[in-house]
Amino acid sequence: MVATTAVTAALILVAGCGGSDKKSDSGSGNGGQSTTSATPSAPTVPSFDPPKALSVAAAFPSADYQGRSALDEAQMGIAGQVALVGGFAGLNGHDVANPNNQWMIPSKSADTTTVSGASKPMAAKVDGKDVAVVAYAEEDKGNGTQKPSGLILVQWIDVMTGKKIAEVSTPVSTLDGTGSDAIGSPKLTNTAYDPETGQVAVGVSTIGNSSVLSKTLAVFADPKTQKSTIMPAITPAAVHDGVIAGAKGSNDAKATDGTILLADGASGKVTKQLPLKQPVPTPLAGGAKHAYFYGSRYTDYDAGIAVSAIYALDLSTGAVVQTAPALPQKDVVGYDCIADQATSIVCTSNGNSGPEEILGLDDTTGKKTWGYTSLSGGRVVPQRVTAAYHGVVYAQTEAQPVLLDAKTGQDLPSAAPSSGGPSSSDTPSSGVTPSSGDSASTGDTPSESDSPSDNGDLGLTLYNGKQESPVAVSPFGGVYRQLPTGNDSSDLESVCIFVKATA
């Protein structure tokens, strides 16, 4: 791929692969349903479900600020036509069709609270609205008679208005000490969510020491009830229609108490448990029908002989389907998996410097439908699968972004980058700082000391000229994180690149 600012890269896919090529009839978000505009004349951009051609259209800066933790790396997402940039300070929204529609929702409202973790922004539908969901790990030093406590905060934000529609704060621990390293301080391990309801399960671990044990737990939160439930000793893998799938057990290599389970989110009651006679399985991903885990156990510990599998747990029946790795066992460490919010799960092997594997699973059955390895010959396993959406897999090879059919694993042909940069019509006008009418209501906007203010879209002056695979996708396009470059980058932590859907 040509790395020059005068070149716009585009991925062109053939019709009939990985879903319908039909252009969406409405300004839909994730799910193809119409969305009520913030104003009657709110502008929209073309949408395709799923996007099958992507072109760089905008760059949104994520400003650095004094005191930022080295762990606070901006995370990108997209909900409907709003690009999302999240971090410890809060969540920024940039309407890709209307640069005047920008907002920032802070992660905390009390001076006694510090933030030590943030999830990536997640996109969901709540009451037909495109909503961003984000979770934070926080430490509150207490006030008056209140003891210091560890909190998990979940926010749901209407992306077209920049208003919070729900918020749930859940105390999960008592702190001994101050700061993010205090005993009892919560850390986010993973998140699982339901894109159809906005329900979320947050995996949490707490810091321990020789006298205070570390805890593992899941926090289930629902935007409709604005209530939460704590489920001890569980790491979540999937949430769908109020049902949580998760794993529990010991991490010791010789452990045999590893179990996968189903639970009711509202009550926290475990409804089904399936012992696997191995160490605790690793949650991978969740679809509408199944939750996915990776597990391994030694058959001869002294000889280092083990067997492993991907387990698909039916969210309704509790039935389990196993998929064995295609690689030799010595080359298998684990998998990273992504659900396409339709009927497919795509997984790639991780953690080894040897052979690599990619495979697809049918979420309807939980069974493997395709796959190949770097030993197969003739095909390259992508370096990273960055996103999957409605039948299309978005991935990055060493040379360029690529796309695969999520159901078959077949390549979706791409064209060479077109010459010339994006036209002025491709990029929103220079951004403006949100006015009081653009931003969230009083109490939703941070003070100057809370977070730097993103100054909106700066055109493509921050784009480095090399298009990459998006990490999040909606019918309007996708986003990815780019490191800042150039003379104007010293005050930036990163740049959010928006690639619009053109087909």
Positions of the model-derived regions?
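Repeated scaffold domains used in trafficking and secretory/extracellular systems
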Residues: 64-80, 110-126, 170-193, 230-248, ...
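Beta-propeller blade signature
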Residues: 149-162, 214-222, 258-264, 307-318, ...
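Short, solvent-exposed loop/turn segments at conserved positions within beta-propeller repeat blades
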Residues: 84-86, 143-151, 209-215, 251-258, ...
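C-terminal motif of bacterial Sec signal peptides marking the signal peptidase cleavage site
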Residues: 12-16
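Loop/turn-rich, solvent-exposed surfaces of beta-rich toroidal or solenoidal domains
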Residues: 332-360, 367-421
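Aromatic (tryptophan-biased) beta-strands that constitute blades/sheets of beta-rich domains
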Residues: 29-75, 80-86, 90-118, 161-179, ...
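Long, acidic/polar, low-complexity amphipathic helices and coiled-coil-like
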Residues: 93, 98-289
